[in-house]
């Protein structure tokens, strides 16, 4: 799904780094997968993949399963990790993350 945007080796390394429950840190993950240095267009493409229901927002249930977008066998985020991730990205307080909020969080 991320071919041409992200390198498989970077994704594998990023997933390995947050295998343990409670170890997911979105900023570190975005850096490790190589997303931080990507263009706005590439970040928007990644957002489109993560936005499973195509609502133009990433909601809490989609964040919980965030890692599984990168590998089907990846773990779900814990409730605490999901809440922290949502709070970090939801700058307008509407309970979901839009594409601009996502881009700002990635560039963080």
UniProtKB/Swiss-Prot annotation:
Keyword Acetylation part of the UniProt annotation: yes
Residues annotated with N-acetylalanine modification: 1
Entries under InterPro entries matching the protein: EF-hand-dom_pair, EF_Hand_1_Ca_BS, EF_hand_dom, Parvalbumin
Record-annotated EF-hand domain positions: 38-73, 77-108
Binding site for Ca(2+) 2: 90, 92, 94, 96, 101
Residue sites binding Ca(2+) 1 per the record: 51, 53, 55, 57, 59, 62
Domain of life: Eukaryota
MF terms (GO), sorted A to Z: calcium ion binding
Keyword entries, A-Z: Acetylation, Allergen, Calcium, Metal-binding, Muscle protein, Repeat
Gene Ontology CC: one annotated term: cytoplasm
Transmembrane regions listed in the UniProt entry: none
Function: In muscle, parvalbumin is thought to be involved in relaxation after contraction. It binds two calcium ions.
Protein family (similarity comment): Belongs to the parvalbumin family.
Other notes: This is the major hake parvalbumin. This parvalbumin has an isoelectric point of 4.36.
Protein name: Parvalbumin beta
Organism: Merluccius merluccius
